[in-house]
From Swiss-Prot:
Localisation: Secreted
Glycosylation sites: 46
SUPFAM superfamilies for this protein: BPTI-like
Tissue expression notes: Expressed by the venom gland.
Protein name, as recorded: Putative Kunitz-type serine protease inhibitor
Family the UniProt entry places it in: Belongs to the venom Kunitz-type family.
InterPro entries: Kunitz_BPTI (IPR002223), Kunitz_BPTI_sf (IPR036880), Prtase_inh_Kunz-CS (IPR020901)
Stretch forming the signal peptide: 1-20
C-alpha cells in the first residue's frame, strides 16, 4: 500500500508540474488581426513553434493572445509568469489596466496641472481613427489603456504608459508629453476637413451647371447661324401696306 501511495503521489506531482509549466489558455488563441485598419506592431504566442512572434494588429476586436511587447509574451506564455501582461483592448473605447506590484503612491492633487493632465475624464473624441492611448483613472489611481479617435481629446491622453505614471503618481513637475519617433502622425483638424468638403460639394454643382448652360448656348448659336430666317424675321412696314392696297385697287 505504501508503494502504491507513493506512486500515486508522484503521478499527482508530475501532473501538477506539467499544468504549471504549460502556457495559460490565452496563449493558445489564434492570431487575430481584427477588422479595423490601424497598424500596430504586437506580439503573440505561437503554440506550434512555442515562440513569441510579431504581427500587425488592426486596433480592435482582438483576443487575449495579443501583447504589447515581446517580453510580456515571453513572461506570460513561455515562463508562465503569475502576473498577467498588458493586453490590447478587444473593442473601441475598452479600458485595460496594467497591474503594478505593490501599492501605488498617492497622487499629488494640489500640483499645478493635475486637474488637466490627470483628473480630466477619458475622451475618445468624435473622429473614427483607432489610436492606443493611456489615461489616468482618478478613482482607481491607475493608468488605463483606451482607444482614441484622433481628434478633440484632452490632456489626460498619453502615448506611453510610463509617462502617465510619472505625471500622475509621482512628485515631479507635470509637463506636456514629449514627442517621439514612434508616435502617430498628427491628424488634420476636423473643422478644416469638413469645411473643405463643404466647399467642394458647393462648387462642383455650380461648375457642372455652368458647363451645361455654356453647351446649350453654343448649340443654339450654331442653329441660328445655319437658319438665319429663324433669328431675323421679315420686317413689315407701312409702305408694304400701301403697296398691297394699291395693287388690290387696280385689280378691282
Amino acid at each position: 500500500m505504501t508503494r502504491e501511495k507513493s506512486l500515486a503521489l508522484l503521478i499527482t506531482l508530475a501532473a501538477a508540474l506539467a499544468a504549471a509549466e504549460s502556457p495559460p489558455g490565452r496563449c493558445h488563441s489564434p492570431k487575430t488581426v481584427g477588422p479595423c485598419r490601424a497598424s500596430f506592431h504586437r506580439w503573440r504566442y505561437n503554440a506550434t513553434s512555442q515562440m513569441c512572434q510579431e504581427f500587425i494588429f488592426g486596433g480592435c476586436k482582438g483576443n487575449a493572445n495579443n501583447f504589447v511587447s515581446k517580453q510580456d509574451c515571453f513572461q506570460t506564455c513561455i515562463r508562465g509568469g503569475a502576473a498577467e501582461a498588458t493586453v490590447v483592448p478587444s473593442g473601441p473605447a475598452t479600458e485595460v489596466a496594467t497591474p503594478r506590484a505593490g501599492h501605488l503612491p498617492e497622487a499629488y492633487e494640489n500640483r499645478p496641472g493635475f486637474r488637466e493632465f490627470c483628473a480630466a475624464p477619458r475622451v475618445v473624441g468624435p473622429c473614427r481613427a483607432s489610436f492606443l492611448r493611456w489615461y489616468f483613472d482618478l478613482e482607481s489611481r491607475m493608468c488605463k489603456m483606451f482607444i482614441y479617435g484622433g481628434c478633440r481629446g484632452n490632456k489626460n491622453n498619453y502615448l506611453f504608459e510610463e509617462h502617465c505614471w510619472s505625471q500622475c503618481t509621482g512628485d515631479g513637475e507635470i509637463t506636456e508629453e514629449p514627442g517621439d519617433a514612434g508616435a502617430q502622425p498628427p491628424l488634420p483638424s476636423e473643422p478644416f476637413s469638413f469645411s473643405t468638403r463643404a466647399v467642394v460639394l458647393a462648387v462642383l454643382p455650380a461648375i457642372l451647371v455652368t458647363i451645361l448652360l455654356g453647351s446649350m448656348g453654343v448649340f443654339f448659336v450654331k442653329i441660328c447661324r445655319k437658319n438665319p430666317e429663324l433669328s431675323v424675321g421679315t420686317v413689315w412696314s407701312t409702305l408694304d401696306d400701301k403697296e398691297y392696297l394699291m395693287s388690290n385697287a387696280y385689280t378691282l
